[in-house]
Amino acid sequence: MNFAALILAGGSSRRMGQDKALLRLNGEPLLIRTSRIAAAVCDSVWICSPEPDRYQSLLSQPVQWLTEPQPTGPQGPLTALAWALPQIDADWILLLACDLPRLAIAPLQAWRQQVELLPEDCRAAIARTEQGWEPLIGFYRPAIAPTIAPWLSQGRRDFQGWLATVAVQELPLSDRDWLVNCNTPTDWQALQLS
């Protein structure tokens, strides 16, 4: 079974005030860290960004680049997923945000092993917390792509609502800490102090 990782590095980072993909944790930009971890779990790594030139010189490990079209209206991670899925040849795609500083190899490998056993009609496998699904660290079959377009055509961009319309397997979550992302300078500072 072939697994590809798709890392989204195209957000505007408005609340952070700087590019989250370039934030350094222990001297390593988050995008490099995320791609290194993804490469340990998946057979290939893809990075989706409207500005790949911004990041290409940072990465030494082999990755594939998807140059997302420049936004002409409201975008978001669901729009990026819909655009990228048909371009990647894999049985499953591990979708990752680029700003997951506590992402870890072992839990992702355990999830991959579970996902390999899922029935064909399961279209996504994602962890869930009391706030809802954690879609930016989840597994998706490429065949799910056609279900996204009707959702987007209604002006909807929310993962939670869309995921309610497809067959999703909940993945066990033993430690929520590695799902933490950073959206503001305060979040980033708190993470560095912990």
Curated annotation (Swiss-Prot):
<keyword id="KW-0808">Transferase</keyword>
<dbReference type="InterPro" id="IPR025877">
    <property type="entry name" value="MobA-like_NTP_Trfase"/>
</dbReference>
<keyword id="KW-0460">Magnesium</keyword>
<keyword id="KW-0479">Metal-binding</keyword>
<keyword id="KW-0501">Molybdenum cofactor biosynthesis</keyword>
<dbReference type="GO" id="GO:0005737">
    <property type="term" value="C:cytoplasm"/>
</dbReference>
<dbReference type="InterPro" id="IPR013482">
    <property type="entry name" value="Molybde_CF_guanTrfase"/>
</dbReference>
<feature type="binding site">
    <location>
        <begin position="8"/>
        <end position="10"/>
    </location>
    <ligand>
        <name>GTP</name>
    </ligand>
</feature>
<feature type="binding site">
    <location>
        <position position="99"/>
    </location>
    <ligand>
        <name>GTP</name>
    </ligand>
</feature>
<comment type="similarity">
    <text>Belongs to the MobA family.</text>
</comment>
<dbReference type="Pfam" id="PF12804">
    <property type="entry name" value="NTP_transf_3"/>
</dbReference>
<dbReference type="GO" id="GO:0006777">
    <property type="term" value="P:Mo-molybdopterin cofactor biosynthetic process"/>
</dbReference>
<comment type="function">
    <text>Transfers a GMP moiety from GTP to Mo-molybdopterin (Mo-MPT) cofactor (Moco or molybdenum cofactor) to form Mo-molybdopterin guanine dinucleotide (Mo-MGD) cofactor.</text>
</comment>
<keyword id="KW-0547">Nucleotide-binding</keyword>
<dbReference type="GO" id="GO:0061603">
    <property type="term" value="F:molybdenum cofactor guanylyltransferase activity"/>
</dbReference>
<dbReference type="InterPro" id="IPR029044">
    <property type="entry name" value="Nucleotide-diphossugar_trans"/>
</dbReference>
<dbReference type="GO" id="GO:0046872">
    <property type="term" value="F:metal ion binding"/>
</dbReference>
<feature type="binding site">
    <location>
        <position position="99"/>
    </location>
    <ligand>
        <name>Mg(2+)</name>
    </ligand>
</feature>
<keyword id="KW-0963">Cytoplasm</keyword>
<dbReference type="GO" id="GO:0005525">
    <property type="term" value="F:GTP binding"/>
</dbReference>
<keyword id="KW-0342">GTP-binding</keyword>
<protein>
    <recommendedName>
        <fullName>Probable molybdenum cofactor guanylyltransferase</fullName>
        <ecNumber>2.7.7.77</ecNumber>
    </recommendedName>
</protein>
<feature type="binding site">
    <location>
        <position position="20"/>
    </location>
    <ligand>
        <name>GTP</name>
    </ligand>
</feature>
